[in-house]
Amino acid sequence: MSTTANDEIDTFAKVQARSMPVTTTFTVDGFRIKEYKGVVRGIVVRSPTIAQGIMGGLKNIIGGNIGAYTEMCEQARQHAYDYMLEHARQIGANAIVGMRYDASEVGGTTGASEVLCYGTAVVIEPVKE
């Protein structure tokens, strides 16, 4: 299977962005914050497919985990995280501190969910001993 130049660039950007330290705390062990770049975020809105909606309806009747919804939510979280990393990279950050997720239902009865991943983009440097 061959890839296009855009696919290769996109893949490289994702690998580069994922190597960025991200923490839910406001410090990175062994590093000091040199510069605050600002709040970065990634937002994704997803809605279930018709098939997922039918399966979800059946699970509501008999109970249990709705695997298709769980997978949809996990993919939405990952995409929001990736978008946040890309946003941080674009503004010159090399780390994100104070990362959080938030999710809410949007669109009333459509079952659509918004996932927000956010944090503070920073430039860090190793602590000199």
Label for each model-derived stretch:
Residues 40, 45, 53-100:
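Short, well-ordered alpha-helical segments
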Residues 25-28, 102-106:
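Short, solvent-exposed loop/turn elements at beta->coil junctions and helix N-caps
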Residues 101-102, 126:
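Short, ordered loop/turn segments at secondary-structure junctions
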Residues 1-52, 94, 111-129:
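N-terminal presequence-like segments and the immediate start of the first folded domain
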